[in-house]
């Protein structure tokens, strides 16, 4: 039995399998076949075995995207929650946080190879794990100085976040803006909201 997954459905897996084993289904090298499946860029882990009645079982764990890089040297790639970078697919697209990155990370396809990459990943996971922020934040813009600007989903202002640190404090200020200031002043009164400085929230109309 072959389990469906987002990037690799039954049809794709069966076609890939038939191309690998051809007509000799009785003499399958499972390690070799697992390695061939593992070489597919969207596969995180794979286990292949035969059950007691001879059925071939394939279990595939795919990478689950949590953000998509849409600019910079790594554009057209997804990121998973552990920082693995893998390509988008024509077979499947998931709506996730968009990243405009002006920072070149490592060549080993791992976001966590640098301190900034680890801190950025922590911020992305923080957003995705929060019910409120995951709904209102659609894009992150990362400049060459490693400062981040948040682009909300439903309003026009930019939120200047700065370096992805002090997450609890900065997101609490963003929460304060949307729950206290916006109801009093309106959604699009301010063009920028700056939360990068400690103990300050600066709202600018210009």
Model-found features: residue ranges?
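Extracytoplasmic
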Residues: 8, 28, 51-55, 72-74, ...
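Hydrophobic residues embedded in beta-strands of well-ordered beta-sheets
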Residues: 54-56, 85, 147-148, 200-202
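Flexible glycine-/small-residue-rich
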Residues: 2-3, 60-64, 100-103, 152-154, ...
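Soluble extracytoplasmic domains of inner/organellar membrane proteins
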Residues: 105-109, 113-175, 179
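Extracytoplasmic segments of membrane-associated envelope/inner-membrane machinery
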Residues: 58-139
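Terminal hydrophobic membrane-targeting helix
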Residues: 1-92
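Extracytoplasmic/luminal low-complexity segments enriched in Pro/Gly and acidic/polar residues
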Residues: 161-206
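Short secondary-structure junctions
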Residues: 38-44, 127-136, 184-188
